[in-house]
């Protein structure tokens, strides 16, 4: 068990369109409870004096400003879907403020998607104002990665049929957009203080995401001290009502939630 202190900030906890979606008239979308408003999912980890971002969606700028954050040591990407990478252009102020390229770690397929989505960042000549990335392929998902003295364990999982990654950082693990966790990955998820699991809604079942009952079942199997659910749609229901139904060690995450342990 790690002995360093953690601070976890949930920058966003919503599904790909956020909550509410444009034009929504359902009761959850019209709720006055700020915990029912969800930007796209991302988490900011402060651990061993490092600042780590997992995923960088379209709300990244808004999220960083809301939390008064202005530095990232490196970014981990789970997969290439738009709601998880399209905010990468907005790392430019961090490039300027801290005079550094932004290290990004992901599967080779995801690194290629970053190049495809942001081709202007990789032109061969210097142009003022471009984002600057330092791209790192995670070639072997069976090997841990050591980044600035922080051990990162890639966690192969499935988003439907798409192979993606979760990540373990010490006693914390993040499994968004998950539909299936291989047994070999579950073996890497023992002894956790906190695990974050994607849980799209209560029902119906979904082909590429866990619903709440399935996420609870996975949480019980992993037996972390505390479990938080993320990547939540309006179909989950009201935060307050759902939270009251959950076991004592399980929680709906919400935007701006901070954990210290």
Give the label of every model feature segment.
Residues 1-175, 184, 241-261:
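Binuclear metal-dependent hydrolase catalytic cores
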């Amino acid at each position: 068990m790690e002995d360093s202190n953690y601070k976890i900030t949930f920058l966003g906890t919503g599904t790909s369109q956020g909550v509410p979606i444009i034009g929504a008239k359902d009761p959850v979308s019209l709720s006055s409870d700020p915990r029912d408003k969800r930007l796209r999912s991302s988490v900011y980890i402060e651990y061993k004096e490092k600042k780590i971002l997992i995923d960088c969606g379209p709300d990244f700028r808004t999220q960083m400003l809301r939390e008064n954050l202005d530095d990232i040591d490196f970014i981990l990407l789970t997969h290439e879907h738009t709601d998880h990478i399209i905010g990468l252009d907005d790392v430019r102020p961090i490039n300027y403020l801290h005079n550094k390229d932004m290290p990004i770690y992901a599967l080779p397929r995801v690194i290629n998607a970053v190049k495809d989505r942001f081709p202007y960042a990789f032109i061969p000549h210097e142009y003022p104002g471009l984002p600057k990335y330092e791209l790192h392929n995670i070639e072997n998902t069976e090997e841990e990665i050591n980044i600035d003295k922080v051990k990162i364990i890639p966690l192969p999982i499935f988003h439907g049929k798409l192979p993606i990654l979760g990540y373990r950082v010490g006693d914390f693990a993040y499994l968004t957009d998950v539909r299936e966790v291989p047994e070999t990955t579950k073996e890497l998820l023992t002894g956790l203080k906190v695990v974050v699991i994607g849980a799209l809604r209560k029902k119906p079942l979904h082909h590429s995401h866990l619903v709440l009952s399935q996420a609870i079942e996975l949480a019980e199997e992993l037996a972390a001290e505390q479990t938080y659910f993320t990547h939540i749609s309006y179909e989950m229901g009201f935060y307050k009502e759902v939270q009251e139904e959950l076991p004592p060690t399980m929680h709906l995450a919400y935007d701006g939630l901070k954990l210290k342990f």
